[in-house]
Amino acid sequence: MSEEKRKQHFVLVHGACHGAWCWYKVKPLLEALGHRVTALDLAASGIDTTRSITDISTCEQYSEPLMQLMTSLPNDEKVVLVGHSFGGLSLALAMDKFPDKISVSVFVTAFMPDTKHSPSFVEEKFASSMTPEGWMGSELETYGSDNSGLSVFFSTDFMKHRLYQLSPVEDLELGLLLKRPSSLFINELSKMENFSEKGYGSVPRAYIVCKEDNIISEDHQRWMIHNYPANLVIEMEETDHMPMFCKPQLLSDHLLAIADNFC
C-alpha cells in the first residue's frame, strides 16, 4: 500500500460541555503526519453561537453537524470516527446511518451503547451511580415545554477534580473559560429504537480505556466493553477523563495504531 493511501481522515467529536477546541493538541499531531483531521462543534457547543442547549431537544439535533459532514463525504471515502465521553452517542448515531462511510469508530472513555437495549442504557447505568454530591455543584436544570430536557453545566470543582485532575492546569483553565451548558438527552434516547446490528453493529469499534478517569470510571468503561465487546481495547495508564490534554502524544499514537489496524 502506498504512503498516500495510508493517509486517513480523522473526525474528532467532543464530549458534553466541550467543543472542537478540546482537540487542539491532538489535531496538529495527526496533521503533521499528513493525515486529514476534522474537529467538529456539535450543536450549541464550542463556538456555535447560533443556538443554546435549550434550543436542542434531541441527540440527533445535537449531532446534526456530524451528520451533515457524513452526508457530504463522497461515497468512496471512509473516515476514522473518534468520540470522547458523551460523544460516543453521536458516534453511534452516525454509525447507524452511515456504516459504509466509516473504517473504524474509536470510543475514548466514551459511552458505547449496544443493540439489545435502548440507546440510553449505558447512560442510565452511569446516572444511577451518580449522587447529587457527585456532581460537585454542577448545574442541572430541566428545560422544554414539558420539562423533559435536562441541561448540565459543569462546575469548576467538578472539572478540576473529576475530569482534569491529571491534566495541565492551563488546559483546565481553558476548559473553564470555554465550557457551555450541554445535555445527555437520557429521556429522549430512552424512547428511541435500538441501534441496529446492520448499521451501528457492523462498524468495527475500538475502545480506549482511561484508567484514572474520575467520572466515567474504569469499572464503567469495562462494563460497557463487556456489555457490547469492542474489536480492540487499549488502556491508557495514569490518564484522567481528558486524555487529549493529559497525554495527547500517546492518544495520537493510539489513534494512528488503530487506523493502521482497521483501514
UniProtKB/Swiss-Prot annotation:
Q: Quote the catalytic residue positions.
A: S85, D213, H241
Task: Supply one GO BP term.
Answer: nicotinate metabolic process
Activity regulation statement? Esterase activity is down-regulated by salicylic acid (SA). Down-regulated by agrochemicals Paraoxon, 3,4-DCl and Profenofos.
The answer on whether this UniProt entry bears the keyword Ligase reads no
Q: Which InterPro entries match?
A: AB_hydrolase_1, AB_hydrolase_fold, MES/HNL
Q: Which Gene3D superfamilies match?
A: alpha/beta hydrolase
Q: In which pathway does it act?
A: Plant hormone biosynthesis; Lipid metabolism; oxylipin biosynthesis
One function term, GO molecular function aspect: carboxylic ester hydrolase activity
EC no. given is 3.1.1.-
Indicate the enzyme's highest-level EC class. Answer: hydrolase
Q: Which reaction does it catalyse?
A: methyl (indol-3-yl)acetate + H2O = (indol-3-yl)acetate + methanol + H(+); methyl (-)-jasmonate + H2O = jasmonate + methanol + H(+); methyl salicylate + H2O = salicylate + methanol + H(+)
Secretion signal span? none
Its GO CC terms are: cytosol; vacuole
Going by the entry's taxonomy, the superkingdom of the source organism is recorded as Eukaryota
Q: Which UniProt keywords apply?
A: Hydrolase
**Which PANTHER family does the UniProt record give?**
METHYLESTERASE 2-RELATED (PTHR10992:SF1081), METHYLESTERASE FAMILY MEMBER (PTHR10992)
- Which family does the record assign? Belongs to the AB hydrolase superfamily. Methylesterase family.
The record's function comment reads: Methylesterase shown to have carboxylesterase activity, methyl indole-3-acetic acid (MeIAA) esterase activity, methyl salicylate (MeSA) esterase activity and methyl jasmonate (MeJA) esterase activity in vitro.
Protein name per its UniProtKB record: Methylesterase 2
Source organism of the structure: Arabidopsis thaliana (Mouse-ear cress)
Q: The organism's lineage? A: Eukaryota, Viridiplantae, Streptophyta, Embryophyta, Tracheophyta
Q: Point out the gene that encodes the protein.
A: MES2
